[in-house]
Amino acid sequence: MEMKIFKDKHTLLKEILKTKGTSFVPTMGGLHKGHLSLVKQSKKSKFRTLVSIFVNPKQFNKKSDFKSYPRNIKKDIKLLKKLKIDYLYIPTLKDIYGFKPKNKVFLDKSSKKLCGKFRKGHFEGVLNVVNRFIEIIKPRYIFLGKKDYQQLYLIKKHIEKRKIKSKIIECKTIRESNGVACSSRNLNLSKSQMKIASNIFHYLKNLKKKIKKNYSLFKINKIKKELIKLG
């Protein structure tokens, strides 16, 4: 079966109704090894694989971040065709935000901690779009990576609280050869910034080993100070 591309939710829904259900992989495009790993996991399920590409404006704190987000739709389509997915959904803004969802977004209090402390409204924007995709597609499974762990936790909480039937499938973080987690935004990093990101990963990995080996608090704090210096 050749991959079908949909840009309108109504024609997509007609197609989905012919199936037993879908395994959904939501993305914002700029596909990399991490995304492709999710797609491969999805293809192992008994349902049709549906990938979405939608750069969600609601989850960006700055308009400049939204505009600079890496986009290469032709390359993304080529990669997905190669993996022989069933459906690709590239919705318009109206498709996603042109209706009132039945479920209100449940935002757990932990959304204001960690990453949420510095990215006001980000997680609300993520949950808003995920909630809308779920109402449109009603997927059996949703495949998400552990890379954005706080985001994953909040989506799971929303699904649990709203008693949504879609099941979350957690997939491992895929990394570059230097240890940095695969991310579309890595394209925006300079060589020196990429080196810093790689060093941070290796320091954290080292710190984890030391904690497991019951190293003294003094030695652990020394590593922490070195990590802070890296930025």
Segments (PLM) and residue ranges:
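Nucleotidyltransferase catalytic core that binds NTPs
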Residues: 2-230
